[in-house]
Amino acid sequence: MEEGWLKARANHGRIGQYLLTNDSVGCGTSRRFSSHPHPRAPERSCSLPRGSEDCDGFLMRPPTKCPYHKPLGFESAAVTPDQISCSNLEQYTGWYASWTANKARLNGQGFGCAWLSKYQDTNQWLQIDVKEIKVISGIITQGRCDADEWMTKYSVQYRTDENLNWVYYKDQTGNNRIFYGNSDRSSCVQNLLRPPIVSRYIRLIPLGWHVRIAIRMELLECMNKCV
């Protein structure tokens, strides 16, 4: 895909653009976006900057390339707590009750600012139910805001119905694709899905981590036009 601007609008009103390149974009490292008038260091927000068009609408038929991408709503809270779940949810008691799947929201701050997996192995997962079949075109991840804990790599599963088996997102060789994630607590790393996923349920499967599996995230929805 040629370089261009990913035009996106968060549901809470912040409007802006992501720069699309042929590789994953680390928007907290090489490109830092913040709408806060006095951003704090070293925590770097991965917000959308002001100043672009107001984009809306999405494409239900999967394109090979997505011309526009819109945040699904983790950060804005348009994605509600009942849409996000995780492995071993019934064991999130005591201290872990503050670090449940619902806390896996991009740019979350304060105590309980991320999802922390209670167990550190590759059997863990973070799941999103988008409530209807959508075209998902990208994933943005961050680590834990207040400690050096993050996910370094992951795979993706999806399905259109809860009664169907999970399907792994594959690479061009037919193997399960490995997505590379974070290398610090605050930078945002964006991985675009080419082709995008047409699905209702999405799972992130952590394959590597620093100290502990810790995730803040956003999903990107594919749109065919900006209106």
Predicted segments, located by residue:
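A broad, structure-centric signal for solvent-exposed, well-ordered loop/edge residues
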Residues: 86, 91-93, 137, 163, ...
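A short beta-strand element within beta-rich, extracytoplasmic domains
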Residues: 84, 135-146, 204
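Disordered, acidic Ser/Thr/Pro-rich linker "stalks" and the adjacent N-terminal cap
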Residues: 2-131, 171-182, 227
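Trp- and acidic/polar-enriched beta-sheet ligand-binding modules for extracellular glycan
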Residues: 120-123, 146-227
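Signature of small four-pass
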Residues: 129, 136-142, 154, 159
